[in-house]
Amino acid sequence: MTSHTLNELIAEGVRGRYILVRSDLNVPLDGSAVTDDGRIKASLPVLKKLSDAGARVLVTAHLGRPKGAPEDKYSLKPAAARLAELADFKVQLANDTVGDSAKELAAGLQDGEVLVLENVRFDARETSKDDAERGAFADELVALTGTNGAYVDDAFGAVHRKHASVFDVATRLPSYLGDLVHTEVEVLRKLTTDTQRPYVVVLGGSKVSDKLAVIDNLLGKADTILVGGGMLFTFLAAAGHKVAGSLLEEDQIPVVQDYLKRASDAGTSFVIPTDVVVASRFAADAEHEVVKADAIEDSTFGASGIGLDIGPESAAAFAAQIEGAKTVFWNGPMGVFEFEAFSSGTRAIAQALTDTVAFTVVGGGDSAAAVRTLGFEDSQFGHISTGGGASLEYLEGKELPGLSVLDR
């Protein structure tokens, strides 16, 4: 990578300069309470570096998927408040992104202070497919930095988006790679080049369609792919088994069958669960039992049973595969971990990752939320990615606009 780094920017001198930082503050909320502040904590080091160096920092970020206009439930207020609690520098929040509030507060910023601009997705131009519209919004963001500004991309969770605050501002200001993004890319490189073998990939989550491209790219690169989560039922169906009322993407069965055929030629083996936890309905207190994966309809609940977790036999088999690995990448929970009764599979995978001496990477999103919800510490894993979609697209071999624009 030929991108300039944050350390280079600081070496040039940032005291008194406005530095626009794209951070990842897209955190889960329960009302106005942040339920997982992992991304906020991950954003802190770069902001602190710039603050300590005397920069006047303008933070852009998004939260959720507002429809191009302000919505209270997507405000950055809770995230900015949590950032202020964690920081040892002054943090303020503007009531808008490029309006009067942002301009007034930016003008009053002192060296070392941080101003969080309101959710960039409150402006429809942020995500516009029209280059001119995005460019116009980027121009207004850049205008806040005055005549000697710079841009730092520290939001790995957004680098796969060609959005104004990620891509277009980088074409208008001297641009630098934030430490968080730099670390993420270096970690993902270890999963794609010179990977220590055996390389085991654990894939879960609800839909196999979300993982097709990454599976395709991993054939021949990963030694073993362990399949759990809702997507496992499409694999079972592809092998000719009935899955009762479990989540099934029938249109993906031929694709999965093709992958299963190609895998052996490519030197990659798929490991599919041999037992699953089947429930009477989708609820935390649902009746449930463990059955063989090839006999789901033989459960007490018959054809209406719903598979909500991998079974203990499968969890142990997956853990054994992880124990023998030198590199492990995990993306997607094994079951409905939010319900205690169906969290055992996900917990077993997390525990196996903490027990192994292998280099372990937890791909962001639901997997990161799961390990924290289940009581594991970030430090117990080699790396927890802040970008679920971005990490998958990187492993798919796709070009990520937010990274390619920084290469020069």
UniProtKB/Swiss-Prot annotation:
Keyword annotations from UniProtKB, A to Z: ATP-binding, Cytoplasm, Glycolysis, Kinase, Nucleotide-binding, Transferase
GO cellular component: cytosol
GO aspect biological process, one term: glycolytic process
Residues given in the record as substrate binding sites: D24, L25, N26, R39, H62, L63, G64, R65, R121, R161
Group of enzyme by EC: transferase
InterPro entries reported for this sequence: Phosphoglycerate_kinase, Phosphoglycerate_kinase_N, Phosphoglycerate_kinase_sf
Positions annotated to bind ATP: K211, G307, E338, G364, G365, D366, S367
A Pfam family per the record: PGK
Catalytic reaction list: (2R)-3-phosphoglycerate + ATP = (2R)-3-phospho-glyceroyl phosphate + ADP
Main location: cytoplasm
UniProt EC number: 2.7.2.3
Molecular function GO terms recorded: ADP binding; ATP binding; phosphoglycerate kinase activity
Pathway: Carbohydrate degradation; glycolysis; pyruvate from D-glyceraldehyde 3-phosphate: step 2/5
Subcellular location: Cytoplasm
Family, per entry: Belongs to the phosphoglycerate kinase family.
HAMAP family attached to this UniProt entry: Phosphoglyc_kinase (MF_00145)
Quaternary structure (record): Monomer.
Descriptive protein name: Phosphoglycerate kinase
Gene behind the chain: pgk
